[in-house]
Amino acid sequence: MSVKIRMRRMGSKRKPFYRIVVADSRMPRDGRFIEEVGYYNPLTNPDEVKLEEDKIFEWLEKGAQPSDTVRSLLSKAGLMTRYHDAKYGK
């Protein structure tokens, strides 16, 4: 089972709101997920992002792969550099 950290689209038409979830890669985008680890609202100015860092680090250590969009959100929040430093001992 390949696990991904990706965005699940919520909200109404033309007003997207995304939940950042951990899901099996075989499940559909808005299908069943394992755990919710944050959310992203692109409609606010500036964009509103809430991440549960401890849960995200836990899943990254277990081998979950973030999608490209989630990886960029994690990088902007500084989580990917902290994870990389912790993993490779800087």
Swiss-Prot record:
Organism whose genome encodes this protein: Lactobacillus johnsonii (strain CNCM I-12250 / La1 / NCC 533)
GO biological-process terms attached to the record: translation
Pfam family, one: Ribosomal_S16
Gene Ontology CC terms: cytoplasm; small ribosomal subunit
Gene that produces this protein: rpsP
Protein family membership: Belongs to the bacterial ribosomal protein bS16 family.
UniProt cross-references to InterPro entries, sorted A to Z: Ribosomal_bS16, Ribosomal_bS16_dom_sf
Protein name: Small ribosomal subunit protein bS16
GO molecular function, one term: structural constituent of ribosome
Keywords: Ribonucleoprotein, Ribosomal protein
